[in-house]
């Protein structure tokens, strides 16, 4: 992982600089100071609406000493960011953030949020449900998933009722930050699969495999290693995908979202609205994840007539339509209706035509499962907000997706969902990233599009150009884009992230 070098301030380096420069002229000393300042600026980059260096240092010192002037400086920066963003073309500049148990310490979370504001961000996307754990307090977690703070609570280091999700929303708003939750959708996490009565909830393909038994190296693993596809992971062994048609899965997920919404975030983003990754294109019905009991029953129930239903059942079971199945179906239909059936003169040809028709029905059914699950999430939000007037206005709703991993149904998401495409293409000038953004805009011209960029400020990272370069490229071809997010705090502030990961 790329680690930004830790720089000491020029004032702390002054004694050494002064000693080394005694033999040299004043011009040389000034040149050295200018060089050091340039290095600091290059590593910080040029984020728009950033807090001035002197104010950053002052705020850090005030926080560490618990000075009474700290809240006033926070309020000042809040007003400055609000004013600056209102005049900047990018009205919403967001940063992705994952919290850890150490963030339950008030001073740690305050430092994280101060760092985010310092770089000119006015929105933060917080991971609230991922890898089988949820950002709810142990004492108020009605979901099947483990609380993020469970281990810390068990160790006696965090109170069972500590609500980190509510706290980051409160502290974020104190600083003028809008706070969104980012939730995995169809990936429920490995721990969910270990619940005895949830085995039937998992997505299953035509070979009886779940995403656990099918776990494999990601076909794009090399791309992950060299930075070409930062949204993908080397393997999906811990990714447990559910059958989107399963009522238990829908109920569990709706309940989790309702609990998270009680903390009144500004928005909620849904990621992993897809099935498990597979090698290459699916070209056989048994490759599709529609063999769970709920998905299969829903597919058969949607068939237009009994004959098509019978053929689909054969197709699902055998992965093909044998010619003799056509003849058998005609005989069955004749017995049922009492009408003489016109026999096909070429059963093999009729079987192939039937396969093409049934294949399209099966593929559409798979797509529809994802779209229906997205609508379940939206319905859960609407129901929660409408049934509880204390929650205020309805939060923004968005879908996070990869243009490849979610192909080809991301453009079918409801228009009410913001588009947050992970535009992670690699090129020196950022134009390839801009091209991906244009692709999403053209496919969803009426939807809000807020691209997700990978990288860091002021420098390239594993082939990703600087965030400044990518944003300039996007603005050049899509000036209507006024919302952008950066993945992630871990890459922008690597030292802080590593220190917080270390635990309490």
PLM feature spans:
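Substrate-binding cleft of secreted/luminal carbohydrate-active enzymes
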Residues: 402, 420-504
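Aromatic- and glycine-enriched glycan-recognition loops and surfaces
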Residues: 103-119, 148-175, 369-372
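Active-site-adjacent "subsite" loops/lids of carbohydrate-active enzymes
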Residues: 87-104, 180-262
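Polysaccharide-binding and catalytic clefts of secreted carbohydrate-active enzymes
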Residues: 214-385, 396, 403-413
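Mature N-terminal, pre-catalytic/accessory segment of carbohydrate-active enzymes
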Residues: 2, 34-111, 115-121, 126
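The substrate-binding groove and active-site-proximal loops of carbohydrate-active enzymes
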Residues: 93-103, 143-162, 236-251, 358-369, ...
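Short, acidic/polar
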Residues: 102-117, 248-259, 402-414, 433-437, ...
